[in-house]
A protein has these predicted regions:
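Conserved residues in the N-terminal Rossmann fold of short-chain dehydrogenase/reductase
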Residues: 30, 286, 315
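Alpha/beta-hydrolase active-site loop signature
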Residues: 8, 33-37, 110, 290, ...
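Flexible "cap/lid" subdomain of the alpha/beta-hydrolase fold that forms the substrate-access gate
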Residues: 36, 42-80, 87-311
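Hydrophobic residues on the short alpha-helix immediately C-terminal to a glycine-rich phosphate/catalytic loop
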Residues: 17, 92, 334-338
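Catalytic active-site module of serine/aspartate enzymes centered on a nucleophile-bearing elbow/loop
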Residues: 308-342
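Conserved HGGG/HGGXW glycine-rich cap/lid loop of the alpha/beta-hydrolase fold
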Residues: 1-44, 53, 82-84, 95
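A generic secondary-structure signal
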Residues: 20, 66-70, 338-341
Length: 342
């Protein structure tokens, strides 16, 4: 079983369920992804000079295949990806269903591979509408906003994440809090479409105030909140591991993923798989109180169309965006139920 973390996390995020998965009889590996934690060998030059070809979606899948081979294995029974790790996991399952025998996507649903311009030779153009400039549309709202993925792609984001006025520990504690079930305003619902007026219904940690940084956004959201609530599932000592690692590495390595994910030119490699479906058994596990479920409108509803062997969704009550940390026992059961049903 291969466990793939998201942003801003580490392999350490799987600490609560790894031993129990191993006790169930599996060889379990969690790894730091390219740009995170203890990884090295990736381009850590300045923002302007970074070789972003290292961070394309297909290269992240390649990293994963290379790792498994290096460990002496020729297949993975199940790849489990959380948040941006679910992007890696879904791509691995999409591209190499022979190698990744099943996939669990957590907290970030697979939206499908999209369509290429079709039948253009005969003037019957389908699937080639220009993409919505969502940043421009969000900025034009009565309350101007911006999408966090595009903010995370900017030249200033890494420094702002690294040196928040409230201090890194308080910032990360607040970020965990507002995206968890402990923030009582997390009552997500499906959005109708990928358009500014709909996306703006999401909280500020996803669709940010236009002129605020992420640390400023979190500080304002935390003004009346009790940050101690999250300590029941994220101790000071555990949070200290993240603080230590991010202080050591900085954030640009992790943020480079957003730079490729938000740049159509950097997504050209994925166009090779346009129209392809995930062909191995697949399931989606997520916190019931997680807005991440709906940040790609329609993705959850379309799972039976984007995955040929979709086995259903599991929403875990009492968990927001960090289910394997907020409700590890329930996540463990959901993963084992899926894997053992194959």
């Amino acid at each position: 079983l291969l466990l793939v973390h998201g942003y801003p996390e580490l392999a350490f995020s799987w600490r609560k369920i790894m031993p129990a998965l191993a006790d169930a009889g599996y060889y379990v590996v969690a790894f730091d992804q390219r740009g995170y934690g203890r990884t090295n060998g990736w381009d850590d030059s300045t923002y302007a000079k970074t070789d972003l070809s290292q961070f394309t979606m297909t290269n992240l899948a390649r990293d994963t295949v290379v790792l498994v081979n290096a460990l002496g294995y020729t297949e993975v029974k199940c790849i489990v990806g959380h948040d941006f790790g679910a992007v890696t996991a879904s791509l691995c399952a999409l591209i190499r269903p022979d190698f990744f025998k099943s996939v669990v996507m957590m907290s970030h649903p697979f939206k499908g591979t999209g369509a290429l311009p079709f039948n253009t030779a005969h003037g019957d153009v389908q699937g080639s509408r220009p993409p919505v400039d969502i940043q421009r549309e969000l900025a034009k709202l009565p309350e101007p906003r911006k999408h966090y993925k595009w903010y995370n792609s900017t030249a200033v984001a890494a420094l702002q994440w690294y040196a928040p006025l409230q201090g890194l520990e308080a910032f990360l504690r607040g970020y965990l809090h507002v995206k968890s079930a402990d923030w009582e305003q997390n009552k997500p619902f499906p959005l109708e479409a990928w358009k500014a007026s709909e996306l703006a219904k999401m909280p500020y940690y996803y669709i940010m105030p236009l002129h605020k940084s992420m640390p400023e956004t979190i500080a304002s959201m935390m003004e009346t909140e009790d940050e101690n609530k999250t300590k029941k599932w994220m101790s000071d000592a555990d949070l200290g591991v993240y603080v230590q690692e991010w202080t050591r590495t900085g954030f640009q390595g992790g943020l480079n993923w957003y730079r490729t994910a938000t740049d159509p030119a950097k997504l050209a490699d994925v166009a090779l798989f346009a129209g392809k479906k995930i062909e191995c058994p697949a399931t989606f596990i997520s916190g019931k109180q997680d807005w991440g479920n709906f940040q790609e409108p329609g993705a959850i509803e379309n799972f039976p169309k984007t995955c040929t062997q979709f086995k259903g969704t599991t929403f875990i009550d009492g968990a927001g965006h960090w289910p394997q940390q907020e409700q590890p026992e329930k996540v463990l059961k959901a993963i084992l139920d899926f894997v053992e049903s194959l």
